[in-house]
Amino acid sequence: MDKLIIEGGSRINGEIRISGSKNSGLPILAATLLASGPMHICNLPHLNDITTMLALLRCMGVGVTIDEKMCVEVDPTSITEFEAPYELVRTMRASILVLGPMLARFGKADVSFPGGCAIGSRPVDIHLRGLEAMGAEIEVDGGYIRAKAPNGLKGARYLMDTVTVGGTENLLMAAVLAEGTTILENAAREPEIVDLAECLIAMGAKIKGVGTDRLEIEGVKTLNGCTYEVMPDRIETGTYLVAAAATGGWVKLRDTRADILEAVLLKLEEAGAEITVGEGTIELAMHGKRPKAVSFKTAPYPAFPTDMQAQFTAMNAIAEGTSSVVETIFENRLIQVHELNRMGANIRLEGNTAIITGVEKLKAAPVMASDLRASASLVIAGMLAEGDTLVDRIYHIDRGYECIEEKLQALGVRIRRVPG
């Protein structure tokens, strides 16, 4: 199992390009199953989760061709299998997203219960109840969701009892080919859902309320193939900005967007960062200053994203002052605190709240990543520590960050990968 070794004392300084969004690319790849012809999806990041989703499409008989720039042609007209097997689904939660498209287009789907990061309970019951409201017949058998809609899906009004990104995406994709009008209430509003909706609209879907918590979808008979470019990764953007702020450095990020990261940028400015936004660029400068502690509570978009909590917690560990971080989305997502404390951080857990008193320096230690974003926070902590930090189980980080060591090396960080 590969590990990362980070030499402490690095200060971020340089310019890099931001990759396409994994959390947008995965549902868009699932949406290709809805098309009546080939789709061309561009700006996909080269990540394990994307590779797994493409492997899942291939095992269903879908034609997949990839060029050297990670522009993928997907031809769903050759599909022969309607099962997402455990062997592929077990490593990636987003594989559940093929359920809605398969059911809408082909009237049947067998999908194994998904895997992914171990960060708490993320039940799929909202997906299933929504599909049942649209006329699907669903049973759970032997770890598989077995769904069918012999008479096709019908439009329905469905109120999601909690805000769920995956549930919104699955039901949105199911609704675009359903007969009649579907209204999804309490829908998630994340930019990745907007990106998916815009891709579906480019394919011929009729969707109103994009970017709001009420989506109205008028079903159509067929969707066409199209060419679509995935949005930039806002969490990768935020991670490199936090790394620069924590180390007192400077960074310029290209091919990204500031409008999808407002809550994060506001907190970075509160920490003392000077931020300059250009056309497709974000620049952050700390001028060698130690960041100030910032308190926040995670919540669904447009509030502070749970996927940035761990990185800010690492920055707060060496910040000037005391902060509180409240995690309201996933119950186990403060798990990296124990590893940060092993590196000399002063963090106290009270339920879903971390009380962080900043220390001047962390000390290197061997640490273990528990999920995707926790692993990113430990890499940032390694930059801030005295000595060499070894981060184990970095397969988590490879699920969400394209070429992380190469990008950090380009920014002046002394980091290397060693085979396990």
From Swiss-Prot:
Gene3D superfamilies: Enolpyruvate transferase domain (3.65.10.10). Cell wall formation. Adds enolpyruvyl to UDP-N-acetylglucosamine. The active site is at 117 (proton donor). Phosphoenolpyruvate binds at residues 22-23. GO terms for biological process: cell division; cell wall organization; peptidoglycan biosynthetic process; regulation of cell shape; UDP-N-acetylgalactosamine biosynthetic process. One of its GO terms (molecular function) is UDP-N-acetylglucosamine 1-carboxyvinyltransferase activity. Keywords: Cell cycle, Cell division, Cell shape, Cell wall biogenesis/degradation, Cytoplasm, Peptidoglycan synthesis, Pyruvate, Transferase. PANTHER family: UDP-N-ACETYLGLUCOSAMINE 1-CARBOXYVINYLTRANSFERASE (PTHR43783:SF1). The modification 2-(S-cysteinyl)pyruvic acid O-phosphothioketal is found at residue 117. Pathway: Cell wall biogenesis; peptidoglycan biosynthesis. It catalyses: phosphoenolpyruvate + UDP-N-acetyl-alpha-D-glucosamine = UDP-N-acetyl-3-O-(1-carboxyvinyl)-alpha-D-glucosamine + phosphate. It is found in: Cytoplasm. It comes from Saccharophagus degradans (strain 2-40 / ATCC 43961 / DSM 17024). It is an enzyme of class 2 (transferase). UDP-N-acetyl-alpha-D-glucosamine binds at residues 93, 307, 329. It holds the Pfam family EPSP_synthase. Disulfide bonds: none annotated. This is UDP-N-acetylglucosamine 1-carboxyvinyltransferase. One of its GO terms (cellular component) is cytoplasm. Belongs to the EPSP synthase family. MurA subfamily. The keyword Disulfide bond does not apply. Its EC number is 2.5.1.7. It comes from the Bacteria.
